[in-house]
């Protein structure tokens, strides 16, 4: 592009640009020329990476000998056992000479005592709370099962049989025969469920 004779707006004089030849070497003693360090990436570096120093076994044993052990700690102050909920528990500090067998024995005794107390309390509650008469039977080896209607002892033999209703109550063969004739309510006071011919059946003991 020829810039000679070019007139720009706002300028009275014509532009006369200065041409600089970049291919010409400039010999200037005052110019600050710094040397550039070249790094050859194709060569293997002379220095080697640092390797981890292996610690010998003797050095480790010497360091471990300085660590305090349980035997080197003086015996702490003993604390009395604390009974909580029937079990015996010891405080955070315990004597070093107490064996594990003794501690296990004390814990077993505490659990045994707590179990015995729980059984005694449950037995006393069962004795105080008894079911209403005629509602259910507390069957024990020394108790005899009786008919829910006549109260006679129920015995299963060749002459008599035991019958049961759908509600769960037991009757002798004589009372069961009367109950099977017509639909009647259960004679037990707290039951009063309807007993029909289909809802009463014999028990083979």
From Swiss-Prot:
Gene3D superfamilies hit by this protein: Zinc/RING finger domain, C3HC4 (zinc finger)
Top enzyme class: transferase
Zinc finger extent (RING-type): 147-190
Any one GO biological process: stalled replication fork localization to nuclear periphery
Entry's Gene Ontology molecular function annotations: transferase activity; zinc ion binding
Listed EC numbers: 2.3.2.27
InterPro entries given in the database record: RNF4, Znf_RING, Znf_RING/FYVE/PHD, Znf_RING_CS
Pathway involvement of the protein, from the record: Protein modification; protein ubiquitination
SUPFAM superfamilies, per the entry: RING/U-box
Transmembrane annotation, as ranges: none
UniProt entry keywords in alphabetical sequence: Metal-binding, Nucleus, Transferase, Ubl conjugation pathway, Zinc, Zinc-finger
Reactions it catalyzes: S-ubiquitinyl-[E2 ubiquitin-conjugating enzyme]-L-cysteine + [acceptor protein]-L-lysine = [E2 ubiquitin-conjugating enzyme]-L-cysteine + N(6)-ubiquitinyl-[acceptor protein]-L-lysine
Pfam family for this entry, one: zf-RING_5
Gene Ontology annotations for the cellular component aspect, listed alphabetically: nucleus; SUMO-targeted ubiquitin ligase complex
Compartments reported by the entry: Nucleus
Subunit organization: Part of an E3 ubiquitin complex including rfp1, rfp2 and slx8. Interacts with slx8.
Biological role stated in the UniProt entry: Mediates ubiquitination and subsequent desumoylation/degradation of sumoylated proteins and proteins containing SUMO-like domains. Involved in maintaining genome stability where it acts in the cellular response to DNA damage.
Stated name of the protein: E3 ubiquitin-protein ligase complex slx8-rfp subunit rfp2
Species in which this protein is naturally found: Schizosaccharomyces pombe (strain 972 / ATCC 24843)
Gene: rfp2
């Amino acid at each position: 592009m020829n810039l000679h004779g070019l007139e720009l707006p706002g300028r009275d004089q014509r532009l006369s640009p200065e041409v600089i030849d970049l291919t010409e070497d400039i010999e200037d003693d005052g110019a600050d020329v710094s040397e550039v360090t070249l790094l050859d990436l194709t060569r293997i570096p002379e220095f080697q990476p640092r390797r981890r120093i292996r610690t010998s076994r003797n050095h480790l044993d010497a360091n471990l000998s300085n660590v305090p052990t349980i035997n080197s700690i003086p015996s702490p102050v003993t604390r009395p056992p604390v009974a909580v909920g029937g079990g015996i528990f010891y405080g955070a500090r315990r004597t070093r000479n107490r064996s594990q067998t003794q501690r296990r024995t004390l814990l077993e005794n505490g659990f045994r005592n707590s179990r015995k107390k729980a059984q005694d309390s449950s037995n006393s509650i069962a004795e105080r709370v008894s079911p209403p008469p005629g509602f259910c039977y507390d069957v024990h080896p020394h108790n005899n099962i009786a008919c829910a209607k006549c109260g006679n002892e129920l015995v299963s033999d060749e002459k008599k049989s035991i019958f049961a209703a759908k509600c769960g109550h037991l009757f002798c063969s004589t009372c069961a025969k009367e109950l099977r004739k017509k639909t009647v309510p259960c004679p037990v006071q707290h039951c009063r469920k309807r007993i029909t011919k289909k809802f009463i059946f014999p028990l083979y003991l």
